[in-house]
Amino acid sequence: MKLSIIIIATSLVIAVVAFPSKDSKAIENDKTEQRMEIVVQETARACSKQIGNKCKRNCECCGKTVVCGTIYVGGKEVNQCMDKTSDNAILNGLGKGMNFIENTFSFCV
C-alpha cells in the first residue's frame, strides 16, 4: 500500500516538472523574440567577376556553382571566386552541389 502511494506521488511530481505550463512557454518565447535581430548578409546584385577574381560576396561571382571562397596565400587571407573544392573528384562534385545550394539561398539577381 505504501509502495503504491510512493509510486503515484513520484509519477505526479515527474509529470508536473516535465510538462511546464503553456503560459511560461509563451513568456519565454516573447523574451526571445524581443532579442532577435535580422542580419542580411547578401545584397542582390548581378555577377561581375569570373573564377579567380577577388570578391567580397557570392553575388559578385558568375556561375551556378561559383562562390566567393577564402584561400590563404603567404599567410594572408584572400577572397576569390572559385568552384573547385577538392582535388578528389567525388568530394569536388559534392562541394559543387553545396556551392549550388549556397548560391540558391543567396538571392542574387
From Swiss-Prot:
Subcellular location: Secreted
Keywords: Disulfide bond, Ion channel impairing toxin, Knottin, Secreted, Signal, Toxin
Propiece residue ranges: 19-46
Major subcellular site: secreted
Any one GO cellular component localisation term in the record: extracellular region
Disulfide bonds: 47-62, 55-68, 59-108, 61-81
Signal peptide residue numbers: 1-18
Entry comment, domain topic: The presence of a 'disulfide through disulfide knot' structurally defines this protein as a knottin.
Function according to Swiss-Prot or TrEMBL: Putative ion channel inhibitor.
Protein name: Hainantoxin-XVIII-5
